[in-house]
């Protein structure tokens, strides 16, 4: 991807289902769970590099023994930093207690992070500072085991203000406006209520406080806590939590916006944001890893009992299509095929753009995430060529010669790795003009791959958000090869609307497609349209979010996709570019055909799966009209 965009986040939960001694005997280490968590997090590093966190809960420890351990880091290699610190704890313990160290029970009692429950998180920050306090898991402490709570998630809620007001109504005094704190306190509030309910129930039966605590731990209704906590949530989320006594859960939003996958055998239960990560770390077949259903929670009790329960009535499935295009690891079997299909669906428009002149066309891609879609594009071009070959051979009939046949069979798409990405250049120069010159050299080219002033150069990117890197760097350096024409194709459709479910695409003015539409409106003397829409958007924002419509969609209805793409090309064309420039985007139909199970496309279409999405779009437009450069939620 030429434009780097961030998103939240990666989450993993492991519950060991056997005693720690089992893993020592079978796998040679009582730290089996920690090793697996490290591998899961290391494999999901694509999902978060702003920080990381790990927490564990020890089951059935003696009074006076710490049972919750947590470590978070914002170091450049946060996951490695965390597990290096944890490893040092074991090294120190072994050096100081060589005689006791090999005793598993001694380890559990005396060494931190020897828990049977392990929660890991990788963070990409879309809101709030990049500090240690922003890193998950978050902890709500209490002296009672069953009132302790740890939460980590891949989520974004659109209605934090509303949820904070509800916390105030409940008598709380929140000090931070953040969805992470809001979620923690909502779950914590209903966890407290459930504890109070059970305490009263067992007190009436005459049990002592000590015995009541034990009964509460056995009887806590995790599902009811989640049902009450999530009633007002509007957003996309996978929420994972652990309670101090040993219950744990993972809850997915009712539209299935954010991904979660689950694997369970008789040794371990694991939930993670990505399927192939589980497959690789636990060496299991794709059929053994299943998706956590939207609106459901995976709940595991302290005694190891596992259930999946409906928490929120599932709504229309709108799983995030950007996960398939870009965010998720490309080695997932289905995602790999889907990205290939995205490339294939571009073939007809590409052939039309080059006037079917494959002899004078070079195909390439922008490294590295576009590689799989590029493979699909090339396969589609190859199929077209093969059909042409067959037609030409049949036309020759008995007049065919070895020389003629050889020329026909020699036709193939011209594929070159034209553009290369070098390591980031470090610089202390801060003025914008100098930075622009330096970014030019982040990408390099392979010389003599293009016939000067003859060839068309077709380059695939997986998406174009702002287009800054294309304009400042890629197009300029491609032009040094002297192609007659440069065609940039995007395997994703035009990004037109803000995301509010965890992707860092929240400000309208940062979308080149929005800039193009606004430019077209101004060129056609229709600026009154913007004023009218501004008034409409403000009026919509006075309504409850459930009644609002997305007025931003009206901006794009005046123009065809092709007109907007053409204007994008005009806006992205750097001064002095000699080659003709054309931009081609994936169609919505092509996206849906390629990714049939992930139809969440609100950033392309403005069709938000939750009411909060329309509110965010309207607020984003009002911000644009008022010159406010901040996100709308």
Task: Kindly give the residue locations of the regions a language model identified.
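Cofactor-binding active-site loop characterized by glycine-rich and histidine/acidic residues
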Residues: 76-130, 375, 380-386, 397-448
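A phosphate-binding catalytic loop at a beta-strand-loop-alpha-helix junction
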Residues: 456-473
């Amino acid at each position: 991807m030429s434009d780097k965009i961030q998103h939240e986040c990666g989450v993993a939960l492991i519950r060991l289902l056997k005693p720690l001694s089992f893993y020592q005997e079978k796998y040679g280490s009582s730290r089996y769970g920690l090793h697996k968590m490290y591998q899961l997090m290391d494999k999901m590093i694509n999902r978060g590099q702003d920080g990381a966190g790990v927490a564990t809960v020890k089951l059935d420890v003696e009074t006076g023994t710490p049972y919750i351990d947590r470590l978070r880091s914002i170091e450049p290699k946060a996951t490695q930093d965390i597990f290096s610190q944890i490893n040092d704890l074991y090294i120190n313990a072994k050096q100081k207690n060589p005689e006791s160290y090999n005793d598993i029970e001694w380890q559990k009692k005396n060494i931190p992070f020897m828990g049977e429950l392990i929660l890991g998180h990788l963070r990409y920050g879309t809101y709030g500072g990049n500090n240690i306090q922003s890193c998950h898991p978050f902890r709500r402490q209490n002296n009672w085991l069953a009132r302790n709570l740890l939460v980590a998630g891949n989520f974004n809620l659109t209605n934090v203000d509303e949820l904070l007001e509800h916390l105030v109504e409940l008598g709380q005094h929140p000090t931070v406006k953040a969805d992470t704190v809001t979620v923690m306190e909502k779950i914590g509030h209903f966890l407290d209520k459930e504890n109070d309910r059970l305490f009263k129930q067992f007190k009436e039966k005459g049990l002592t406080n000590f015995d009541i605590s034990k009964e509460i731990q056995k009887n806590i209704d995790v599902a009811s806590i989640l049902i009450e906590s999530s009633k007002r949530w509007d957003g996309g989320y996978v929420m994972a939590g652990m309670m101090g006594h040993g219950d744990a859960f993972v809850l997915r939003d009712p539209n299935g916006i954010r991904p979660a996958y689950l694997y369970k055998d008789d040794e371990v239960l694991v939930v993670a944001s990505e399927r192939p990560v589980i497959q690789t770390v636990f060496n299991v077949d794709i059929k053994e890893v299943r998706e956590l259903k939207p609106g459901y929670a995976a709940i595991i009790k302290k005694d190891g009992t596992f259930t999946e329960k409906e928490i929120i009535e599932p709504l229309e499935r709108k799983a995030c299509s950007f996960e398939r295009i870009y965010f998720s690891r490309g080695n997932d079997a289905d995602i790999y095929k889907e990205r290939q299909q995205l490339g294939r669906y571009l073939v007809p428009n590409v052939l039309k753009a080059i006037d079917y002149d494959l002899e004078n066309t070079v195909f390439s891609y922008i490294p590295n995430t576009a590689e799989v879609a590029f493979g699909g594009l090339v396969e589609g071009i190859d199929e077209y060529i093969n059909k042409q070959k067959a037609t030409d051979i049949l036309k020759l009939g008995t007049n065919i010669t070895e020389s003629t046949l050889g020329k026909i069979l020699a036709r193939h798409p011209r594929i070159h790795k034209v553009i290369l990405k070098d390591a980031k250049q470090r610089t202390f120069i801060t003025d914008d003009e100098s930075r622009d010159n330096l970014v030019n050299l982040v990408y390099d080219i392979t010389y003599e791959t293009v016939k000067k002033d003859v060839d068309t150069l077709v380059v695939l990117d997986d998406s174009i958000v702002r287009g800054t890197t294309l304009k400042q760097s890629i197009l300029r350096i491609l032009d040094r090869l002297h192609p007659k024409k440069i065609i940039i194709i995007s395997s994703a459709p035009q990004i037109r609307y803000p995301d509010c479910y965890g992707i860092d695409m929240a400000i309208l003015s940062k979308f080149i497609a929005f800039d193009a539409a606004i430019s077209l409106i101004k060129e056609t003397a229709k600026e009154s349209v913007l004023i009218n829409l501004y008034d409409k958007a403000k009026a919509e924002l006075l309504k409850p979010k459930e009644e609002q419509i997305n007025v931003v969609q009206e901006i794009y209805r005046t123009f065809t996709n092709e007109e907007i793409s053409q204007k994008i090309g005009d806006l992205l064309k750097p001064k002095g570019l000699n080659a003709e420039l054309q931009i081609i985007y994936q169609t919505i139909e092509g996206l849906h055909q390629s990714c049939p199970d992930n139809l969440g496309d609100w950033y392309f279409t403005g069709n938000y799966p939750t009411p909060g999405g329309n509110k965010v779009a309207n607020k984003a437009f009002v911000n644009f009209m008022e010159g406010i450069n901040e996100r709308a939620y």
